[in-house]
A protein has these predicted regions:
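A conserved acidic, glycine/proline-rich C-terminal tail/linker
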Residues: 192-229
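Electropositive, beta-rich accessory/interaction domains or terminal extensions
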Residues: 1-178, 182-191, 196-197, 231, ...
Length: 242
C-alpha cells in the first residue's frame, strides 16, 4: 500500500508501467499475466526510488501554472524496478534472467519482451476502486478471510454506510478524492480468474470467482476515469459531487 500517489488522466502514476509482451497472447491484450503464469504472483517488484516513482518529477511546478499543466513523464531511472524472485534473488526488471524465469513451464510459444510505458497498461479503464465493505461481504459469503489484494484496486474506500457493494450505486456520479482529484465512476468492474488467485501464494481457489459470479453477476468494485488530476493520500476524504 502506498502512503500517497499521483492520479493522472492515464491512471495512477507508476501503476503497471512494466509488462511482458507475449507472442502467445491474444492480440487484443498481448501481455502475459497470472491467468497464464500463476507463478508471476510470487515475484515481488519494488521501485528502486519509491519517492520518485510516486509522482511526476515536475508536479509542483506544473500544478502552479493555471489551470494546471499536465506534468512531465518520469525519467527511466526514476522508475527503475527490482524484482525479488521466489528463490530470494533480486534482479532488475530488464535482466534477461528474469524473462527466462517467467517463461519457465509455459505451454506453447511464449516469446517474452519487456515493455515500459508512461501510462498504466491497464486491462480496461485508468482507475479501479472497491470498498473495504465489499471485500468484507465477500468474506462473509465465503465464510473465510479474503485478501483485499485479490481485487487489485488502485483505490480502497472505507464507506460510512458500511454496506458492501454500495460503490455500485455511484456509477454515473463524480467523486472528489482528497483536496483536488476528481473522478467519474463509469461502470461496475467485471471480474475474472485473477480474484481466485491468492496474491501471497499464487494458489488457485476457484470458489472466490464462483461466489462473486453467483451472488453479484461477477462484478465487484467499479471503474473510474480521472477528470481532474491530483495527489491522493491514505486517509483522504471522499465526497460525492453529483
Amino acid at each position: 500500500m502506498l502512503a500517497e500517489s499521483f492520479v493522472g488522466f492515464s491512471g495512477v502514476f507508476g501503476d503497471r508501467c512494466y509488462a511482458f509482451k507475449s507472442s502467445g497472447a491474444r492480440k487484443g491484450f498481448p501481455y502475459m499475466n497470472a491467468n497464464v503464469q500463476q507463478q508471476m504472483l510470487l515475484y515481488r517488484p519494488k521501485f528502486r526510488h519509491p519517492g520518485r516513482a510516486a509522482r511526476p518529477p515536475n508536479l509542483d511546478e506544473a500544478m502552479g501554472i493555471a489551470p494546471g499543466v499536465t506534468p512531465a513523464n518520469a525519467e527511466p531511472e526514476d522508475m527503475a524496478l527490482d524484482v525479488l524472485t521466489p528463490s530470494g534473488a533480486v534482479v532488475a526488471v530488464d535482466d534477461p534472467a528474469l524473462t527466462g524465469m517467467l517463461g519457465e513451464g509455459l505451454r506453447g510459444e511464449h516469446r517474452l519482451t519487456l515493455v515500459r510505458s508512461d501510462r498504466a497498461l491497464t486491462d480496461c479503464r485508468p482507475v479501479s476502486l472497491i470498498s473495504l465493505q465489499t471485500v468484507r461481504q465477500i468474506e462473509g459469503e465465503l465464510g473465510r478471510p479474503v485478501d483485499k489484494r485479490r481485487f487489485r484496486a488502485n483505490i480502497y474506500l472505507d464507506l460510512a454506510s458500511g454496506n458492501g457493494f454500495a460503490e455500485e450505486g455511484l456509477v454515473g456520479r463524480r467523486l472528489r478524492l482528497g483536496s483536488k482529484a476528481l473522478v467519474a465512476v463509469l461502470e461496475r468492474d467485471p471480474r475474472c480468474k485473477m480474484i481466485s488467485l491468492d496474491p501471497e501464494t499464487g494458489e488457485h481457489d476457484p470458489e472466490v470467482l464462483r461466489q462473486v459470479a453467483r451472488a453479484h453477476e461477477a462484478f465487484a468494485g467499479v471503474y473510474c476515469a480521472v477528470l481532474v488530476e491530483g495527489v491522493l493520500s491514505v486517509g483522504d476524504s471522499v465526497e460525492v459531487v453529483d
